[in-house]
């Protein structure tokens, strides 16, 4: 969802048809707002809750809850770091000025041509979508992946280690090599899933 990708708030959904809003990579900081309080309320009501976030957000949730809940399942990611939402907002403003149209959606990793050499894509209200280039060519993605504007705490992250707070850890399987008899890399994307707990 474009608004989630702009850091305007975390989204929780209860219907299966609403889940597509949560798909795709979003490389900007999200605001948790009342997310933790909402989760605690749902857990106490006996609802099953799946929380997905960065490792530090997952750790923060567990610290907030102060106890384990059997009806909570947590998922984190192998995190590169979280870029400044101000930088992203400024970048969107630049695109809107350059293309003379408001941005209605932004895809950080469009895989139309390639998973590995993915493109960024901006969709505008008054014109066709614009492919902004591969991550090496797009200004925002290049700065993000070269660590130019991550949050200060990300440079000394204490959660980027093998021990995890989450039940499940997900990531892209970069560096996968099929030469040892594995399935072929078709450049459509390979995911890694680590189960860290019995629940996971």
Model-derived features with residue positions:
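Short, charged, surface-exposed secondary-structure boundary motifs
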Residues: 82-91, 180
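Generic beta-sheet signal
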Residues: 47-53, 72
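Glycine-rich phosphate-binding "P-loop"
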Residues: 10-37
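Long, compositionally biased charged/polar accessory segments in the mid-to-C-terminal portions
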Residues: 96, 101-200
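A short alpha->loop->secondary-structure connector
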Residues: 15, 66-81
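Single conserved hydrophobic/aromatic residue that forms the stacking wall/gate
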Residues: 1-12
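Short, surface-exposed basic-aromatic patches at helix termini and helix-loop junctions that form
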Residues: 62-73, 92-97
């Amino acid at each position: 969802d474009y608004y989630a990708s702009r850091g305007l708030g975390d989204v929780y959904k209860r219907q299966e048809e609403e889940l597509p809003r949560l798909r795709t990579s979003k490389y900007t900081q999200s605001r948790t707002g009342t997310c933790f309080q909402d989760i605690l309320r749902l857990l106490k009501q006996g609802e099953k809750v799946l929380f997905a976030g960065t490792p530090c957000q997952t750790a923060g949730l567990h610290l907030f809850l102060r106890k384990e809940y059997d009806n909570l399942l947590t998922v984190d990611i192998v995190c590169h770091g979280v870029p400044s939402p101000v930088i992203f907002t400024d970048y969107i403003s630049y695109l809107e000025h350059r293309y003379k149209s408001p941005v209605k959606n932004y895809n950080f990793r469009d895989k139309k041509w390639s998973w590995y050499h993915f493109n960024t894509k901006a969709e505008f209200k008054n014109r066709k979508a614009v492919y902004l280039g591969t991550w090496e060519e797009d200004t925002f993605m290049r700065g993000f992946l070269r660590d130019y504007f991550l949050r200060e705490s990300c440079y000394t992250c204490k959660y980027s280690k093998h021990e995890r707070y989450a039940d499940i850890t997900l990531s892209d399987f970069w560096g996968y090599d099929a030469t040892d008899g594995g399935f072929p890399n078709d450049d459509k994307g390979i995911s890694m899933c680590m189960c860290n707990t019995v629940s996971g």
